[in-house]
Amino acid sequence: MIKKEQSLVKMLLPHIIAVVAFLFITMAYFSPMLQGKVLSQHDVTQYQGSAKEISDYYYNEGKTSAWTGSMFSGMPAYQIGVHGGSPNFLDYLEAPVKALGNTTAGPVFAGMLMAYILFCLMGFSPAVAILGAVAYSLSSYNIVILNAGHVTKAWALAYIPLIVAGFMSLFKNKVLLGSVLVGLGLALQIKSNHLQVTYYTGLLSVILFITYAVEVLSKKNYKSFLM
């Protein structure tokens, strides 16, 4: 029994170290937040203005409006900000990460976690997976869009590696693991509400499938492809 516990600890220890490292790197990068400083994000300010009518109606009337006149000549509110409703399990799943900062550190930390899962499933060592995950999430584009306030895009980008990891698992005939990762990653990404990134993720998935199909069929492994 003791040997099994020691083996489990030995297996989990690199991943625990990875999570702690991601947390340290993220909070070090966003350390000005700990001093009470706030990042000026244009799109967030613009969102607050466009959603004010919906927010005022909800807090004054206690009801959710499905329409707002604050954008263009009026448009559905679900693309801006809908209040009320019961949280689902995805909200609880994201809560610890969003506690780091929904519009700042949260998506960066999430991106590191998702990319780490992808690189580990690709067969890289934990050390290499950590480096790859940090490089993915701290890429200059992610920082630029956060500075501009493109928060929903940052969250959607953070979940791409999880979806890719799921498809790669499916290609390796790991049906249960692949289905869970694709389903969870896609649900979280759609919840982020940035359909442009979801569309690009779909294109990436198609390219991955074609690449896999060509590789398998070139080896005449038809049974594996059909399975």
Question: Could you tell me what each predicted segment is?
Answer:
Residues 25-115, 134-158:
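Membrane-interface coil-to-helix junctions
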